[in-house]
Amino acid sequence: MPPADSNITDLIVASCADRPDAPVYAVRNGAGGWVDVHFTAFLTQVRAVAAGLIAHGVQPGDRVGLFSPTSYAWAVLDQAVWFAGAVSVPIYETSSAHQVEHIVTDSGLRVVAVGSEELGERVAEAAGHAGVDVATFPLTDAGLAELAEAGAFVSDDAVEHARSLATLASPASIVYTSGTTGRPKGAVITHGNFVGAAINVLHFAREVVQWSPETTTSRTLLFLPLAHVLAHAVQVICLYARIQVAHSGSPATLLDDLASFH
């Protein structure tokens, strides 16, 4: 395992240093195809969004909610939360206002990124019932661009300081169950949990992600909700291993996405 005072972002930064030109994500180009996002470009965007979070008052250890369908923007914000030293709290997009209220109060959420106006209204209803103030911002490409613009005055050193504060024992994410059999239950996933999963899957179960040290052509299409801990972990593992990931955010587009991203 890496040093105890390191965290999952150190593993990601080191992987990027090894292959900065690796295509780690693919996004739709609007014409039925996909465009590569290379590692350096991805981390540049992550750092800019992390600066935006810091500019909006997010402090190390704060909880940041992600309430949105599976998407590239989700992947960017997830890493940006960690680069800001904060803790991600994924929320299933199917969660009711009552379930969101429980997650807000249980985790201490004060800011939530939402994938749609309707999800934002659900957060507002939940916060109103809970009697707490919860800020929201859109978890979209445009929303992330606005966040990055807001962080333009935050120095690279400030982001790097925030990024380096967490250790392997620090919380990285609070993952909640879907709530189908009762109140959603939260489990704290540490930076060490994600680091251990990334290293051990590649070492002992590399066939899970079709990875080998000799190839950089493996690709994964993620369609599970990223609020699900398996999908969340697979995304982190793939980024560390430089396995290219694309996202399918709706069952309606899944077959087309599978056919075009292969």
What are the residue ranges of the model-derived segments?
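Conserved AMP-binding/adenylate-forming core of the ANL superfamily
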Residues: 4, 24-79, 96-101, 105, ...
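Conserved pre-ATP/AMP-binding loop-to-beta segment of ANL
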Residues: 20-23, 152-176, 182-183, 209-219
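ANL superfamily adenylate-forming
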Residues: 31, 118-168
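Conserved AMP-binding A3 loop
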Residues: 36-40, 172-199
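Conserved S/T- and glycine-rich ATP-binding loop of Class I adenylate-forming
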Residues: 64, 81, 112, 171, ...
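Short beta-strand->loop structural element characteristic of the AMP-binding/adenylate-forming
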Residues: 65-67, 74, 78, 82-113, ...
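Active-site charged/polar residues at nucleotide-handling catalytic sites that mediate phosphoryl
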Residues: 106-108, 130, 260-262
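Conserved AMP-binding/adenylation subdomain of ANL enzymes
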Residues: 195-219, 224-262
